[in-house]
């Protein structure tokens, strides 16, 4: 039997904050878990780092909707880690921006990592 990913054992609910850190710049944080950045532009919103699953991404979206009704048009994935990229589909963004190396990792490890993260955050 394969050994579980380290993050898989951490099932505790995290304290979430959503703070404005600059004009139209927001930080979504959950202690011990990856953060997401939010940039509110003139016409739309950009998310930086997507979260581990669509359910977790929806927590970001819920907070974004409290401060703007502009559409989420772009998701930027700075690098590959399952907990940062696998929630990207939840945003319905026109563009997902990521480097070729990160894209390759999604193609190579995506399903295995999805299975792990979905067990952690169903």
Question: What does each model-identified segment do?
Answer:
Residues 62-122:
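Active-site HxH/HxHxD metal-binding segment of metal-dependent hydrolases
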Residues 18-63:
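Conserved beta-strand hairpin/beta-sheet module of binuclear metal-dependent hydrolase folds
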């Amino acid at each position: 039997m394969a050994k579980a990913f380290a993050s898989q054992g951490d099932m505790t609910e995290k304290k979430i904050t959503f703070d404005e850190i600059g004009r139209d710049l927001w930080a979504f944080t959950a202690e011990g878990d990856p953060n997401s950045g939010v940039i509110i532009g003139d016409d739309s919103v950009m998310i930086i780092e997507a979260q581990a699953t669509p359910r977790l991404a929806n927590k970001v979206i819920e907070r974004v909707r409290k401060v703007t009704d502009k559409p989420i048009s772009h998701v930027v994935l700075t690098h590959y880690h399952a907990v940062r990229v696998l929630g990207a589909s939840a945003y319905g963004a026109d563009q997902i921006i990521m480097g070729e190396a990160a894209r390759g990792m999604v193609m190579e490890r995506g399903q295995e990592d999805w299975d792990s993260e979905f067990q952690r955050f169903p």
